[in-house]
Amino acid sequence: MLKKFNEYFIQAQFEPIKSFYLKGDLNRKFWNDDDTLDEEIREQLIRIGEDFYEGLEIEGEIVDIAFCGSLCNYNWSEYSDIDLHIIINFDDVNKDQELVEKMVDYAKKVWNEQHNIQIKGFDVEIAVQDEDDLKDSISGGRMGGVYSLLSGDWIKKPSKDDFTPDEDLIRKKATTIMKKVKGLEDDFKSGVEYDDLMDDLKKVWKKIKGGRESGLEREGEYSIENLIFKLLRRNGYIQKIMDVRRKAYDKQFK
């Protein structure tokens, strides 16, 4: 019985791979037959975006409010979020773009933690993006479909790509990382020194995050590294890393 349970548990960790297969159509809860966004949803998303940005109280006009991510593509699934990007020119806020990025990232994190907005059963995740970064992400293939909420038209229409995920390769590479994450959890429980644990954690995180970034640059959203990142996020292993980091930090002061 225990063996069967373990086999089922292991299999369940890879179940999100099934969500990587492309759909034959866009999600019709959101999109009309002519692939324009449902008007009520468009108005709701604009309001959310404007309310968020107004709360930032920073200089700089909104260039656009973009709907992007898997719900604007054929790879949508039960794990999808409504990715809502407020597009601005960072230079209009401050010439120090790194400072602006840190500020809006923090504001995004606070907003997403404080709000639990769902539309058609999907969570709304808000972010602020520089106009030039959006253009670079689109031209570089790092983003699929992108829809302008302000103009009510596609900035980039999604394409029906001929893609099949390599399940065996995803499992193999993800398993290696998952074992390392399990090792981090074991090290924390056994009392490994904080600095040593953080060094190992940073190496694991660099492999995951750095791999994803290089994969997106090289092959776009269907790269094996990006799919591994999505699997680890969907099966809870990204959260495990965050939990170890938080618990290890807190434990220093006990």
Residue spans of the language-model regions?
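Short acidic, low-complexity intrinsically disordered linear motifs used
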Residues: 1-12
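Catalytic core of pol beta-like nucleotidyltransferases
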Residues: 12-80, 87-254
